[in-house]
Amino acid sequence: LCDRRQRQMCIRDRFAEKNKFLPRYHRMTNRLSAYIIDKLRDAVTYTSVAREMNLSVNTVIRVFGVVDYGHKNLPSALSIDEFKGNTGGEKYQCIITDPVKKVVLDILPARTEVCLTKYFAKFSKSERENVKYFVSDMWKPFANIATAWFKNSKQIVDKYHWIRQVNWAFESVRKEEQKKFSKTHRRYFKKSRFLLLKRFDKLTDEQKQQVNIMLYASPTLSTAHFYKEDFLKILDCKDRETAKKPMADWINWAYNCDIPQFVKCAKTMMNWLTGILNSFTTTITNGFTEGCNNKIKVLKRNAYGFRNFKRFRNRILHMF
């Protein structure tokens, strides 16, 4: 772009030609700046955009530097989760979303209770009282924040996370038991682990026969499989009231069984029972938030990480 200058003869002065598409003292058009910013909505790197535009990486970073996202208002439902960002001196960062409208609200520099408290203290009491649902995983600081700052909200433990506790317990028993078998049997058990994890009533007749053969080889695994299957039946409950007694009974049975993995699982379920039962009252989950985390991982992997948290935050919010 040629910077044409005009000369005013009467006062012997020179001045730049005025262009609507070129800000004063700039050599880059507004359209090019807007194009660069729009390209960065995808999980691409500054380097790839700079190469495409034939610009330096620092120029692309400087152009994106004008993008700055402020804080949004709190919705009626909040979803919160952590992800491994390794930026700004912290290993984990925190993402806050609206799981109903599918909107990313903010990214916090850490998942600590101190960081979360500092953030939510910025909102008025009336705004916090309007939050009706608070969805999270089994990270204790999240529950503490919900209790302290969102007294009118219903705390919900995401279904995926508490169901996973039982699957982890069963998988641990399977791995422990298969170590006792011969090499041939170990290989067979390892290849068939998805059959053991899948609900028994969803298997074909042939698959059921395979599972029964494996369970016959290990009484401990057979007991663990029974507890796992009994637990999965609770998922068929339609509401909190119908799930309350079966869940309490299962926790009691698992707590008093002779399998350490399920005893530990029962203790975890007992500690989070209110949030687990509340998950039967609504279809709201952390599914959207987990999906955002996957996209953030792609951005981080492509860029080989971010050292500057503010820049990382703006890139994430810009993508959504």
Predicted segment positions?
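Single conserved hydrophobic/aromatic residue that forms the stacking wall/gate
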Residues: 1-11
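Alpha-helix N-cap/N′ positions at the starts of helices
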Residues: 2, 28-32, 226
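Single, functionally critical "micro-switch" positions that shape active/binding sites
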Residues: 11, 80, 97, 160, ...
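Extended interfacial segments that mediate partner engagement and assembly in macromolecular machines
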Residues: 13-83, 88-89
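Acidic, glycine-enriched active-site microenvironments
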Residues: 25-36, 106, 255-257, 263-264
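RNase H-like nuclease fold core
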Residues: 59-145
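Acidic/histidine-rich catalytic cores and adjacent linkers
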Residues: 64, 89, 101-102, 109, ...
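Short, surface-exposed amphipathic charged segments that create phosphate/polyanion-binding patches used
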Residues: 94-95, 167-178
